[in-house]
Regions:
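Extreme N-terminal tail/first-helix region
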Residues: 1-16
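Glycine-enriched loop-and-adjacent helix/strand subsegments that border the catalytic/binding cleft
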Residues: 16-29, 33-114
Length: 114
C-alpha cells in the first residue's frame, strides 16, 4: 500500500538509565483539577475536572540540561504554561480496581503543558 504522505515517526521519550525509549501513543489530560489555578482562569474552583486528549505528536522532548524550543503564533499575547505530573501507563486494562491501579504504571515524569 502506498501512502499519500509519509507517516510521522512514533513519538517517544527517553527513560532515565535505560537505552530504550518509552513510546507515546496517547496523552490523556485532566483540566481544572487544581482549585487555585481554576480560580486564576476565571472559574470558582468548584467546577468538576474535565478530561481531554492531546495528540502524541504535540510532545516536545527536551534532554536533561538542554533548553527546549517550541514554535507558536507570532501574535500570541498570553502563552500559558503549567507544570504537570506525568504518569506513564505501562499496561492497559478495563474496570481496574483502585487497589490494583498502581500495577499498571510504568513510571512518572515532570511535564510542561503549554
Amino acid at each position: 500500500m502506498s501512502l499519500v504522505f509519509q507517516l510521522a515517526p512514533q513519538p517517544s521519550v527517553p527513560v532515565l538509565g535505560q537505552a530504550e525509549k518509552f513510546p507515546v501513543r496517547r496523552i490523556y489530560c485532566v483540566g481544572r483539577n487544581y482549585e487555585e489555578h481554576a480560580k486564576e482562569m476565571g472559574f470558582t474552583g468548584r467546577e468538576p475536572p474535565f478530561f481531554f486528549l492531546k495528540p502524541a505528536d504535540a510532545l516536545v522532548v527536551v534532554n536533561e540540561g538542554a533548553t527546549g524550543e517550541m514554535a507558536y503564533p507570532s501574535l500570541t499575547q498570553n502563552l500559558h504554561h503549567e507544570i504537570e505530573l506525568v504518569v506513564a501507563i505501562g499496561t492497559g486494562g478495563r474496570n481496574i480496581k483502585a487497589a490494583d491501579a498502581e500495577k499498571h504504571i510504568y513510571g512518572y515524569a515532570v511535564g510542561l503543558d503549554m
